[in-house]
Regions:
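Phosphate/nucleotide-binding beta-alpha loop and adjacent structural elements of enzyme active sites
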Residues: 1-206
Length: 206
């Protein structure tokens, strides 16, 4: 089965773009812990889309998620924001546990992670458990680069990914952003659907 995991689904920007792309998936699992924005995600009309109102992390827990406003994507790391106006207690599930219970070895899994700083916690959990071996394609956005207390982890996880033998990898972090052209940067920050199609092409046309 071809499965897409949208970790840090927000209001469904990536999922909507995946549904309009030339790459076809049997199921799209969305993970979004913030109740304040989950309703928009649930309005996506597709039998393929399964919405989970919890985030993936390295343990099962409840944690505060901080954001600048009620529509902003939030982070479990308070120091991502200079000013916090909204805090919500959210549910999280161990990524390795979820993989073990829901993903089969024969599944063809594409994993997208863009979750405002928790990406390194998730990947470390998948690496330590061995569940990362079920991932055939990975797109990871290193938001830890924006968080002083976590920025050192970007390079650590990069090295693990490089030696992991995950077949297809697209990383977006400090290194890539420094090399991007103005057009690519505009595509990333302003045209989310086009950007998703761009990195899907980068992944699957290697």
């Amino acid at each position: 089965m071809n499965i897409f995991l949208d970790v840090g689904a927000h209001t469904g920007e990536t999922t909507k773009a995946v549904l309009t792309s030339k790459y076809k998936f049997d199921k799209i699992y969305c993970f979004e812990p913030q109740r304040k924005i989950i309703n928009e995600l649930r309005q996506i009309e597709s039998d393929k889309v399964i919405v989970n109102n919890y985030g993936l992390f390295n343990i099962d827990c409840k944690r505060d998620v901080y954001s600048k406003d009620v529509t902003e994507g939030g982070s479990i790391y308070r120091d991502k924001f200079k000013k916090i106006l909204f805090t919500e207690k959210c549910d999280f599930v161990s990524a390795s546990k979820w993989f073990a219970e829901n993903i089969k070895d024969e599944d063809n899994v594409t994993l997208k992670i863009n979750c405002e700083g928790a990406e390194c916690d998730i990947m470390d959990d998948l690496f330590s458990s061995g569940e990362y071996k079920k991932v055939k394609a990975l797109m990871i956005d290193f938001d830890v680069r924006k968080i002083k207390s976590q920025s050192h982890r970007e390079q650590e996880v990069r090295e693990k990914i490089k030696t992991s033998n995950i077949p297809l990898v697209f990383m977006l972090g400090s290194e890539e952003l420094n090399k991007m052209t103005k057009n690519e940067t505009a595509r990333y920050f302003r045209r989310r659907e086009r950007w998703v199609h761009y990195w899907l092409d980068k992944l699957f046309n290697k």
